[in-house]
Amino acid sequence: MKLKFGVPCSKIKDRINDVDIHCSSESEAMAIAAGCILAGKEPEVYMQNSGLGHIVDICTSLYMPYEIPYPRLLLSRRVKPHHHSFMGKITEDILKLLQYRNIELVNQSWKE
């Protein structure tokens, strides 16, 4: 049984109906997931790509140095409206720098 954690996102709500814990931040979801991994569970974390900046510290100061495998990540990638455009462009670069490979990237279009 997979455990799901993350910050609520209306764009992927059909994929996260069975969430175990709605978190107040992306780093909180990643911290809970780390504990689950250490307990032998297989968690999944979901977030919008705008939340990637919030998980950089926990990835580089907890997951990477202690060689904790990353949880599966369901990532909603948005490039519009305007305030999402830059993060949308650098999302894949950030994931590569973090050496994050266990990802499902859900591209989102924006209808105005």
Language-model region placement:
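Thiamine diphosphate
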Residues: M1-E112
